[in-house]
Regions:
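Core dinuclear metal-dependent hydrolase active-site scaffold
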Residues: 2-5, 41, 47-53, 174-213
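Generic beta-sheet signal
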Residues: 137-139, 271
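Conserved nucleotide-sugar donor-interacting segment of glycosyltransferase catalytic cores
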Residues: 125-135
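Active-site metal-binding loops of divalent metal-dependent hydrolases
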Residues: 8-9, 63-66, 120, 200-202, ...
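Cap/insert and terminal regions of metallo-dependent hydrolase folds
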Residues: 67, 82-100, 213-334
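Metallo-beta-lactamase
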Residues: 1-123, 130, 139-197, 215-221, 241-265, ...
Length: 334
C-alpha cells in the first residue's frame, strides 16, 4: 500500500483561528474575531492524500478546493458565505488542482473509487467535482449536520460544493474499540484503513488511520491543524462550537495523544501544517508513497526536538505571529 501527499492549494486564515483558542478565540467572541480580524493573516497549505490500496484501489482522503472557489468567489458563493469568506480566501494554481496532482503520480481522478471526507468544510469538499463517480464516505453525524448553522446563521455545509456526489457512504462506527477510541470503522474489513471519530472541529469530524508495513499514518484532518496542536494544553485552535463541541475537540486530541503512546510507529499527518514538519519531512518523504525506516527515524527525531516529556512543547517552540512587511496584508506564524 502507498500513500501520497497532494498539495491542493493554500488558504488565508486569521492567526487566531489556528492559535487563539487559549487567548479568547472562543464562542461568539471567537466567531466575531474570525470574521473581523483582517490584520493577522497567515497562509497555510491545503492537502489531500491519495492511497493506492492493493485490493480496494485508489482512495482519496479529502479533496481540497476547486478553481471557482479560488478565482470566481463572487459567482460561486451566495448567501452568508459570500460575506463570511474573503474573495482571496483560497489560492490555487493549475498545477495544484486535484486532477493535476493526481496525474503527476501517474493516476487519474476517474480511477478513484472511494473518497473519505474528514469533514464537510469548504477546503475539504471543493474538489468533489473532480471525482463524481467515487463513493464518498463520511461520518453519519457529519451528514446529519447538513442543515445545521453555526450561531443560527452560518451554514456548516455549503450544499453547492457537495451536490454532485452520486453515492454516499455514511459511517456509523460499528467496528468496536480501537486503542484509545471507544468506536471505530474498519473501512474495507481488512484492518488496513481505520476511521476514528474525532468530533469537535465539526460534529462528525473523523481521522483516518492507514496501517502501513511496520508503521501507521494518522491523517488528522482539522482536529489538529499542525503537529504542535498535539500539545492541546499549550496550543489550541479557535473554539466556537459551544462548550459541548469545545470539550469534544479537546477530548479528541487527548485520544490522539494516547493513540500515539500505544502505536510507537505512528506518524501524525495534520490537516494544514505550515511548518518545517510539512515541507521538510511529510511532503518530500511521501513523494514515493512510503516512509523508509530512515525517514521515520528523522520524523521521530524532529518530534523529540519539538516535544518534552508528556507531550509538552520545548521552550521556544510556542507559535507566535510575525507581522507582514510594509505594503503586504499577510504575515506568518513562526
Amino acid at each position: 500500500m502507498k500513500i501520497y501527499s497532494l498539495h491542493v492549494g493554500d488558504t488565508k486564515v486569521p492567526y487566531g483561528q489556528f492559535y487563539g483558542g487559549l487567548a479568547g478565540w472562543t464562542g461568539m467572541r471567537g466567531m466575531w474575531r474570525f470574521a473581523t480580524d483582517k490584520s493577522h493573516y497567515i497562509i497555510v497549505p491545503i492537502h489531500a492524500y491519495l492511497i493506492d490500496h492493493p485490493q480496494s484501489g485508489l482512495v482519496l482522503v479529502d479533496t481540497g478546493i476547486n478553481w471557482e472557489q479560488a478565482h470566481e468567489h463572487d459567482r460561486y458563493y451566495r448567501g452568508v458565505l459570500h460575506y463570511v469568506l474573503d474573495a482571496d480566501e483560497y489560492l490555487l494554481t493549475r498545477e495544484q488542482e486535484l486532477p493535476a496532482q493526481v496525474e503527476r503520480l501517474g493516476y487519474r481522478c476517474e480511477d478513484i473509487r472511494t473518497v473519505i471526507l474528514t469533514h464537510f468544510h469548504e477546503d475539504h469538499v471543493g474538489g468533489l467535482r473532480y471525482v463524481p463517480e467515487a463513493k464518498v464516505v463520511a461520518a453519519q453525524a457529519e451528514w446529519q449536520a447538513l442543515k445545521m448553522k453555526a450561531f443560527g446563521f452560518v451554514p456548516i455545509v455549503y450544499r453547492k460544493s457537495i451536490e454532485g456526489v452520486k453515492v454516499w457512504g455514511p459511517v456509523s462506527f460499528t467496528s468496536g474499540p480501537f486503542h484509545s477510541f471507544d468506536t471505530s470503522q474498519d473501512l474495507f474489513g481488512d484492518g488496513s484503513v481505520m476511521l476514528l471519530p474525532t468530533p469537535g472541529h465539526d460534529p462528525g469530524h473523523l481521522c483516518v488511520l492507514v496501517r502501513m508495513d511496520g508503521y501507521d499514518i494518522l491523517i488528522t484532518g482539522d482536529i489538529m491543524y499542525t503537529l504542535r496542536h498535539l500539545a492541546v494544553d499549550e496550543v489550541r485552535a479557535i473554539l466556537f462550537g459551544g462548550k459541548f463541541l469545545d470539550q469534544q475537540q479537546i477530548d479528541s486530541i487527548r485520544r490522539i495523544q494516547r493513540l500515539r503512546q500505544a502505536l510507537h510507529g505512528l506518524v501524525i499527518v495534520p490537516g494544514h501544517d505550515h511548518t518545517d514538519y510539512q515541507y521538510l519531512f511529510l511532503e518530500p518523504f511521501l513523494a514515493d508513497g512510503v516512509l523508509s525506516l530512515e525517514e521515520r527515524e528523522q520524523i521521530k527525531a524532529y518530534e523529540t526536538r519539538l516535544f518534552r516529556d508528556r507531550g509538552h512543547l520545548v521552550p521556544g517552540a510556542m507559535p507566535h505571529f510575525v507581522p507582514p512587511v510594509p505594503g503586504e496584508r499577510v504575515g506568518k506564524a513562526a
